[in-house]
């Protein structure tokens, strides 16, 4: 049964497999993250996601043992229009990356629910280079890169949705220290989506999650030249495209991994065609009597979920 604010699921009596554990499963939609946790604390819901913005409030509370944290396959990054008059200059893109304090961003702004990025590919995706360290934070070097290129006070606008506003504001402060002006504008999600597809955004913040652990699904879908146009980034490097195409056509898994490592390095460390920020973590809370609660790559796995009535 579906209603605007919830979905009620009951067992299918004709299902061919084993009997399910629960007599009913109710999924309730609650937009406000604080209201959602209030409902959880009052016992009106048995499990729910815990927003990163509230993690600091709950991680040392009485609910700390009810929190489960997972790392999905995605990467959060500063998505930039590589053909923009300001951002088309590689020196500007490199300086932006150097100016960002990813460690502080993860520990303070994101309350520890993130890991500083070292490449575009997530560590859980074959093709991620585990030997790479997190991107360097060096404001002095960022200023020198700009000075050597004869650039002073580069200015651009980063338009974001409300969820990314806090991140954008932090980036704005980091870039200011290096003499880079990033104006931040928060826009409606629908307008954002249309503007990105039309290539109207100089820069924005994106979390990009592959549907499964394969670099083709994470990197080809966003930065292969034909796809990059629709994402509003217009990245175009024939060498990168060639590596991606070769990896797509290969059936040798080890070879594919090496090809993706090279492609990622070109994209995110030679061209700075993208500015990876962090690998986000997700968390949810579940009552002690909830059994087999799992969260995979952005998806709750509910097929084995059960309730231990002796603990309720």
Residue ranges, per PLM feature:
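The feature preferentially marks the first beta-strand/turn patch immediately downstream
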Residues: 1-10, 257-258, 298-312
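Ligand/substrate-recognition segments at binding pockets and active sites
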Residues: 3, 126, 147-211, 279-282
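Append "and occasionally in soluble cytosolic enzymes with long acidic Gly/Pro-rich linkers
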Residues: 8, 88-173, 177-178, 262, ...
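Ligand-site clamp/hinge motif
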Residues: 12-58, 181
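Short, solvent-exposed loop/beta-turn-alpha elements that line the ligand-binding surface or hinge
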Residues: 17-22, 58-71, 79-90, 123-144, ...
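Short, hydrophobic alpha-helical packing/hinge segments within bilobed ligand-binding/sensory domains
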Residues: 36-37, 45, 54-55, 92, ...
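Paired acidic/hydrophobic, glycine-rich loop segments that form the ligand-binding mouth/hinge
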Residues: 45-51, 202-207, 276
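A ligand-binding cleft/hinge motif common to bilobed small-molecule-binding domains
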Residues: 51-62, 210-215
């Amino acid at each position: 049964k579906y209603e605007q604010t919830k979905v009620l699921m009951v067992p299918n009596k004709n299902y061919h497999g084993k009997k399910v554990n629960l007599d009913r499963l109710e999924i309730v939609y609650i937009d406000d993250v604080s209201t959602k946790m209030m409902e959880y604390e009052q016992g009106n819901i048995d499990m729910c996601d815990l927003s990163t913005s509230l993690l600091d409030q709950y991680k040392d509370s009485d609910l700390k043992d009810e929190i489960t944290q997972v790392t999905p396959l995605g990467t959060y990054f500063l998505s930039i229009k590589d053909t923009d008059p300001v951002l088309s200059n590689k020196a500007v893109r490199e300086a932006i990356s150097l100016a960002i304090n990813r460690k502080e961003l993860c520990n303070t702004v994101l309350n520890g629910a993130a890991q500083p990025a070292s490449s575009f590919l997530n560590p859980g995706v074959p093709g991620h280079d585990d030997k790479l360290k997190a991107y360097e934070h060096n404001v002095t070097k960022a200023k020198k890169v700009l000075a050597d290129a004869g650039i002073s006070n580069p200015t651009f606008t980063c338009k974001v949705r409300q969820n990314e506003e806090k991140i954008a504001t932090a980036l704005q402060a980091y870039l200011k220290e290096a003499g880079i002006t990033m104006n931040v504008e928060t826009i409606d999600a629908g307008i954002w989506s249309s503007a990105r597809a039309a290539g109207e955004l100089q820069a924005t913040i994106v979390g990009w999650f592959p549907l499964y652990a394969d670099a083709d699904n994470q990197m080809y879908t966003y930065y292969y030249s034909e796809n990059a146009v629709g994402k509003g980034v217009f990245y175009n490097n024939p060498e990168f495209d060639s590596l991606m195409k070769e990896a797509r056509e290969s059936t040798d898994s080890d070879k594919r991994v090496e090809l993706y490592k090279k492609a990622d390095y070109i994209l995110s460390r030679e061209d700075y065609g993208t500015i990876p920020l962090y690998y986000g973590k997700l968390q949810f809370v579940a009552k002690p009597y909830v059994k087999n609660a799992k969260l995979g790559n952005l998806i709750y796995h509910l097929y084995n979920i059960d309730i231990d009535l002796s603990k309720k």
